[in-house]
Amino acid sequence: WCIMSSPLLIGCDMNTIPDFSLKLLKNKELIALNQDVLGLQAHVVQHENESYVLVKDIEQKRGLTRAVALYNPSDQPCDFIVPFETLELGGNVKVRDLIKQKDLGKMKGEIRQTVQPHSVMICKMEAEKRLEPVSYEAEWAYLPCYDDLGKKSKPIVYVPASDCSGRMKISRLGGREENFAEWSEVYSEKGGNYEMTIFYSCDKNRKLEVSVNGTKTVLKDLNSNNEVKSVTIPVSLKQGYNTVRMGNDFGWAPDIDRFTAVSYTHLRAHETCA
């Protein structure tokens, strides 16, 4: 409830609540996380086997401090290895376990932790540097035509997919102008030219319309034989937040797994190092 900024409701008999559960409910650091001024919900950035890693900004958007949950809903212990780059954190990272209310010291590169079955580890992490995001999952997108009540015929849906990065994809995208997927917080530190790579799947030729801040690119004849494939296009991002929209006004678009956006400056730096 705290990592998702959910309402705080106690659904048990307070006369018989176990001491551990009562202590958890009274944990001031978890309550502070739940009541964080930003009021954001965490999103999944890593999903391997049955484990999940969720992250969100706290205190300040695009700041150096983030909340991270290592969630293990399975029946077996889970060994987490989470690169700090995945969490958009750079340099030395100060880690605090909020459930145990214990500092774990400074770490660099990654965090490694074992989480017991049906358990979660919630951390507050403070980094030396905030990294620019690279990957944007399909399940983070806003879907204006999404319908969870089952009242629409062939509605746009999130579909489990083991070959996708987050184990989910968007299906039944397009068919009409208003049935799109939109990411409104595609962030660029300085703005400029970027290489956008879109990961998709479909079983026949499909068209995808990609709009970046209103500038549209049309990709025709995409066909992956139901495998996850990628297509790369050049895009221009402004400094700060950008809006990316995908769909197809007059036919079905391919299913979308995710997309990445990497600046040409970053690509050239890697090529120079190589």
Regions found by a protein language model. Name each.
Residues S188-D203:
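A short beta-strand element within beta-rich, extracytoplasmic domains
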Residues W1-M4, L9-G11, H47-L89, H118:
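Carbohydrate-binding surface patches
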Residues C164-Y187:
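Short beta-strands within extracellular/lumenal beta-sheet-rich domains
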Residues T265-T272:
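Conserved small/polar residues in nucleotide/adenosyl-binding loops
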Residues M107-P133:
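C-terminal beta-strand-rich structural cap/linker in extracellular carbohydrate-active enzymes
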Residues T215-Q239:
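Extracellular carbohydrate recognition and processing domains
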Residues R206-T215:
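Short, surface-exposed beta-strand/strand-loop-strand elements in extracellular ectodomains
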Residues R245-W252:
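Short beta-strand-plus-loop segments that form exposed binding edges in beta-rich domains
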